[in-house]
Regions:
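Metallo-beta-lactamase
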Residues: 99-163, 292-331
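Pre-active-site segment of Zn-dependent metallo-hydrolases
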Residues: 9-11, 21-80, 84-136, 188-197, ...
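Hard-cation-handling environments
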Residues: 232-371, 386
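Active-site neighborhood of phospho(di)ester-bond hydrolases with catalytic His/Asp-centered motifs
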Residues: 28-30, 54-63, 70, 82-85, ...
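Acidic/glycine-enriched edge-of-secondary-structure segments
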Residues: 30-34, 55, 179-185, 191, ...
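Cap/insert and terminal regions of metallo-dependent hydrolase folds
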Residues: 168, 189-277, 362-367, 384-450
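Core dinuclear metal-dependent hydrolase active-site scaffold
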Residues: 1-52, 133-197, 322-329, 335, ...
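Gly/Ser/Thr-rich loops at beta-strand to alpha-helix junctions
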Residues: 10, 63-65, 163-164, 248-255, ...
């Protein structure tokens, strides 16, 4: 029995690990590598394992950095099932097809200049048909349902509190009369956040593979964060500019809408035009509405009293390209919620092009920004940014609001790890190097756990 560490070992994106036992091979996540172009190009490299030799895929949640290479895996020969939680299965239906559509468009765009330069044309990483082929293999499971997926291999999903359908995965591997329990954290959510439940309590494991996105940081107090959002909205109104909110289509968008509705009167939002300009986020929000049994207690009560749910009276959904382009004619008084969250593509890039050089405009960044992304350059206060090949001076006001992260901070991570009553070996992944190192040191000093930081391709015999 062994674990092989591959994706999200040298950074945050591209989650991907292998478990081997009883002659079977299990793939934990198959995520897209995101960031700078040279990082994204790694997605085209061959997998460090043979896709046709994988017996089953176990997916923690739908975010593309965890699921985004599943169509490529199937395209290259994988034939087995893809297990995940039911809500994640529904979210993947829209996420993977959207990702494939973007890959097709990116290839078309690049091939235009390649053709002019008489360079070889490229193929998209995968197509919508490839995504649909992968989706046919998805098997949805309920939380807390223990399932034998292969001889001697059982799994059980627990709520990770990160996004709808996100999971911690308990995995039991049995071989030659020995059983080892592996717990894969997936992405952990914060405690005491709206809509979703807290991360589940798991008390026993032999090995824990745990994320560390914010393994060296504490998030700002949530109440202070809500106050800050109100101040940003007020400031943007005073400057008579637009307010752009780049947001992940799954999770962050729904939380932003929840707060805008809850504080509609307090933040005087009746003076704004509010646009949800993301077809993916619009469809995802409808899926959120279909899973009220996964909400936390407060959201469940509000959902049962549907007329009392926080809502935005002036919210406008803009699914069509024509509606989206029309927003760019508005120079002030618009709150524009759009994707992608890291500003690596999608409609938000077009809105940035029209607003980033306006002094009265405000850009509120409410999620993690990976190294090399356009969003990270704004967070790092770069004086200019390149959009569609052209440099734009950054004159808009940039606000980084950290308290809304869907990821656990260091205190949340330590709280979750503190639930283990035995002393599992811990393997820290899914973080920048300094975050992984800081978290592993805290685990060793505060919880006296044997914590390591595996590198790409490292193998651990169980």
């Amino acid at each position: 029995m062994q674990i092989e560490f591959y994706g999200a070992t040298s950074g945050v994106t591209g989650s991907c690990h292998i478990l081997r036992a009883n002659g079977e091979t299990i793939l934990l996540d198959c995520g897209l590598i995101q960031g700078r172009r040279e990082e994204a190009e790694k997605n085209r490299r061959p997998f460090p394992f043979a896709p046709d030799e994988v017996s089953a895929v176990v997916l923690s949640h739908g975010h593309i950095d965890h699921s985004g290479r599943l169509p490529l895996l199937v395209k290259q020969g994988y034939r087995g099932p893809i297990y995940t939680q039911n809500a994640t299965a529904d979210l993947c239906d829209i996420l993977l097809q959207d990702s494939a559509f973007l890959h097709e468009k990116d290839a078309q765009y690049e091939n235009k200049w390649r053709k002019r330069k008489k360079k070889p044309l490229i193929e998209p990483l995968y197509t919508v048909d490839d995504a649909r082929a992968a989706l046919e293999k998805v098997v949805g499971l309920r939380y807390r349902e223990k399932r034998e997926i292969l001889p001697g291999i059982e799994i059980r999903y627990q709520d990770a509190g990160h996004i709808l359908g996100s999971c911690n995965v308990e995995i039991w591997l049995s071989e030659n009369g020995k059983t080892r329990k592996i717990v894969f954290s997936g992405d952990l959510g914060q405690y005491d956040t709206p809509i979703l439940n807290d991360p589940s309590v798991i008390e026993e494991a032999d090995h824990v593979i745990v994320e560390s996105t914010y393994g060296n940081r504490r998030h700002r107090d949530r109440e202070a964060t809500i106050d800050e959002i109100g101040e940003i909205i007020s400031d943007a109104a005073h400057h008579k500019g637009n307010l752009l909110i780049p947001a992940f289509s799954i999770g962050r968008t729904q939380e932003i809408l929840y707060y805008l509705g809850k504080y509609y009167d307090q933040w005087e939002l009746d003076r704004w035009h509010v646009f949800l300009d993301s077809p993916l986020a619009i469809r995802a929000s409808k899926i959120y509405w279909e899973y009220p049994h996964l909400y936390d207690e407060e959201a469940t009560k509000l959902r049962q009293r549907v007329n009392e749910m926080p809502h935005l009276q002036n919210l406008r959904l803009t699914p069509s390209p024509q509606e989206s382009m029309a927003i760019n004619q508005i120079r002030s008084g618009a709150i524009i919620i759009s994707a992608s969250g890291m500003m690596t593509g999608g409609r938000i890039v077009h809105h940035l092009k029209h607003n980033v050089s306006r002094r009265g405009a405000h850009i509120m960044i409410v999620g993690y920004q990976a190294y090399g992304t356009l969003g990270r350059k704004l967070v790092d206060r770069m004086p200019t940014v390149k959009i569609h090949g052209k440099e734009y001076p950054v004159k808009a006001s940039i606000h980084t609001v950290g308290g809304l992260s869907a990821h656990a901070d260091i205190d949340d991570l330590m709280r979750w790890m503190g639930n283990f009553k035995n002393s599992p070996q811990v393997h820290v992944v899914h973080g920048e190097p300094e975050a992984k190192q800081a978290f592993s040191e805290r685990l060793a000093t505060d919880l006296r756990l044997d914590a390591s930081v595996p590198g790409p391709g490292d193998t651990l015999e169980l």
